[in-house]
């Protein structure tokens, strides 16, 4: 019985952790959206900043991956 | 279990990441495993592309040779742009990492394949190697001046100690995020495809399968396309972050 | 659905995947017993890739790229040279053309003056001939005219004498000729 409650908590926690991915999605969208709006204003500078955009995406996405990892840990490792 | 037997739905999203010995038996540190197999297939593919493909040394390249040259030029330019001219000395190391990651990622997309880069042990080792060598290099090149990386001289004096603490923490989190980003991305994509794949045979067991099975097959196709993109982008991101860290070590003065 | 199934699995903890996974700590990534194995083989792999790249692939690609760069810049230099040559040739051609044109102009002028000279000579000769002929003609015309006048006078005098005789007069030769002379000249 005790184990069941722990399991339940872990699964609920896993589900909650998944909401973090939404934040990552917002972040990545924000980065790319701003990049595109900037690129449309000044297309000649866009090519040189693509690498910066990918770094930004990577940083924003990493946090979503962390929440996914927490969910996985709760589901399989706790 | 009874329900599982009834519907036939089996979820093993972690199944493709399991490591097992190729020839049976315990997994010791020297045992050839499926990870070994796929790493060696990666080596084989790299040699096919870069050694067999370029054996013509043609001035006007064949298709394979031009792919190899394209990859070379891509990473070479990245290192030069991000880390500067003096970073080119470390180009072979960075190119090795890039090739290993990109081939592991793409070969892992083959059905039934194993993806070495989805394991924290693999990405963690690479990230730690980058972290340690970059830190050592920074101290060797700049001496104590490397610590200037943490002392943000453009900020107001009162804020600098606080910023220094934050910078130090973010510096030491680098290998963690560096490794987990790659492993997590690889793992997430494969696990999601695995979950969709588990839904696919539903049509054999239940009426709602008529609606669910085509949807899940479509979802797998879409995820696969996304994973193709992710496989490349993550290799690119790992490499470019390595270049950024290298630049910090070579030119710590921001 | 995934959670549910897995919950059932895990809770039941029967033999099979879930129990095995639970034994191993769930995620294969966190199964630390496989870490030495992966680290060892990863090191081997990376060293092999590094060795292959630095020994064979990278020098080869770098040399091919350098060769290509050399070929391209060599070709460009050759093209530049050819361009200069073409420019020289063009200049020479233009010079030859203008020379030829000047020569032609000269020849034309010479020819024209020669022709003009000939023409002038011919014209002068023709003029002289014409003048001579004209003089001759005028002379002969004057002769003819004089002859004719004479004839007219003599005919007129004879006719007048005949007419006078016919009218029953006596022909005075001297008076008649004076009268005819006066009439004809008149």
UniProtKB/Swiss-Prot annotation, chain A:
Keywords: ATP synthesis, CF(0), Hydrogen ion transport, Ion transport, Lipid-binding, Membrane, Transmembrane, Transmembrane helix, Transport. One of its GO terms (cellular component) is proton-transporting ATP synthase complex. The chain crosses the membrane at residues 12-32, 54-74. It is a multi-pass membrane protein. Its main location: membrane. It is found in: Cellular chromatophore membrane. InterPro entries: ATP_synth_csu_bac/chlpt, ATP_synth_F0_csu, ATP_synth_F0_csu_sf, ATPase_proteolipid_c-like_dom, F/V-ATP_Csub_sf. Gene3D superfamilies: F1F0 ATP synthase subunit C. The record marks 61 as: Reversibly protonated during proton transport. It comes from the Bacteria. One of its GO terms (molecular function) is lipid binding. NCBIfam families: ATP_synt_c, PRK07558.1. F-type ATPases have 2 components, F(1) - the catalytic core - and F(0) - the membrane proton channel. F(1) has five subunits: alpha(3), beta(3), gamma(1), delta(1), epsilon(1). F(0) has four main subunits: a(1), b(1), b'(1) and c(10-14). The alpha and beta chains form an alternating ring which encloses part of the gamma chain. F(1) is attached to F(0) by a central stalk formed by the gamma and epsilon chains, while a peripheral stalk is formed by the delta, b and b' chains. HAMAP family: ATP_synth_c_bact. F(1)F(0) ATP synthase produces ATP from ADP in the presence of a proton or sodium gradient. F-type ATPases consist of two structural domains, F(1) containing the extramembraneous catalytic core and F(0) containing the membrane proton channel, linked together by a central stalk and a peripheral stalk. During catalysis, ATP synthesis in the catalytic domain of F(1) is coupled via a rotary mechanism of the central stalk subunits to proton translocation. Key component of the F(0) channel; it plays a direct role in translocation across the membrane. A homomeric c-ring of between 10-14 subunits forms the central stalk rotor element with the F(1) delta and epsilon subunits. Belongs to the ATPase C chain family. This is ATP synthase subunit c. It comes from Rhodobacter capsulatus. The lineage of its organism: Bacteria, Pseudomonadati, Pseudomonadota, Alphaproteobacteria, Rhodobacterales.
């Amino acid at each position: 019985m005790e184990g069941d409650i722990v399991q339940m908590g872990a699964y609920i926690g896993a589900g909650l952790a998944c909401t973090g991915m939404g934040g990552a999605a917002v972040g990545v969208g924000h980065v790319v959206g701003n990049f595109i709006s900037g690129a449309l204003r000044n297309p000649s500078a866009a090519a040189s900043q693509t690498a910066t955009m990918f770094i930004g995406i990577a940083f924003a996405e990493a946090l979503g991956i962390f929440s996914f990892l927490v969910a996985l840990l709760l589901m399989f490792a706790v | 279990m009874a329900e599982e037997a009834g519907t036939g739905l089996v979820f093993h999203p972690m199944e493709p990441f399991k490591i097992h010995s190729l020839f049976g038996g315990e997994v010791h540190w020297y045992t050839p495993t499926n990870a070994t197999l796929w790493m060696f297939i990666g080596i084989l593919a790299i040699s096919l592309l870069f050694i067999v493909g370029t054996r013509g040394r043609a001035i006007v390249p064949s298709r394979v040779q031009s792919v190899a040259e394209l990859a070379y030029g891509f990473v070479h330019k990245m290192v030069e742009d991000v880390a500067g001219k003096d970073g080119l000395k470390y180009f072979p190391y960075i190119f090795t990492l890039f090739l290993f990651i990109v081939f592991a990622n793409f070969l892992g997309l083959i059905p039934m394949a194993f993806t070495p880069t989805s394991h924290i042990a693999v990405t963690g080792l690479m990230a730690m190697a980058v972290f340690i060598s970059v830190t050592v290099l920074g101290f060797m090149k700049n001496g104590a001046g490397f610590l200037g990386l943490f002392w943000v001289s453009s900020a107001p004096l009162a804020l600098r100690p606080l910023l220094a603490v934050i910078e130090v923490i973010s510096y030491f989190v680098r290998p963690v995020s560096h490794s987990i980003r790659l492993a997590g991305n690889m793992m997430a994509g494969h696990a999601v495809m695995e979950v969709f794949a588990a839904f696919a045979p539903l049509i054999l067991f239940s009426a709602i399968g008529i609606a669910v099975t085509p949807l899940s097959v479509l979802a797998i196709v879409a995820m696969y396309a996304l994973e193709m993109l992710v496989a490349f982008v993550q290799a690119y991101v790992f490499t470019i972050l390595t270049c950024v860290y290298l630049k910090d070590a070579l030119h710590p003065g921001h | 659905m995934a959670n549910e199934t897995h919950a059932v699995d895990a809770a039941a903890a029967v033999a099979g995947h879930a129990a095995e996974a639970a034994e191993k700590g769930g995620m294969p990534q966190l199964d630390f017993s496989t870490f030495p194995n992966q680290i060892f083989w990863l090191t081997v792999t990376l060293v092999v890739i590094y060795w292959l790249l630095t020994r064979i692939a990278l020098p080869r690609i770098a040399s091919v790229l350098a060769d290509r760069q050399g070929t391209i810049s060599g070709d460009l230099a050759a093209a530049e040279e050819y361009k200069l040559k073409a420019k020289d040739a063009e200049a020479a051609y233009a010079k030859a053309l203008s020379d030829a044109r000047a020569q032609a102009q000269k020849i034309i002028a010479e020819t024209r003056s020669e022709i003009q000279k000939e023409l002038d000579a011919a014209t002068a000769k023709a003029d002289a001939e014409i003048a001579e002929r004209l003089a001759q003609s005028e002379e002969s015309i004057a002769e003819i005219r004089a002859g004719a006048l004479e004839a007219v006078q003599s005919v007129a005098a004879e006719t007048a004498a005949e007419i006078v005789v016919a009218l029953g007069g006596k022909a005075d030769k001297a008076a008649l000729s004076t009268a005819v002379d006066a009439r004809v000249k008149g």
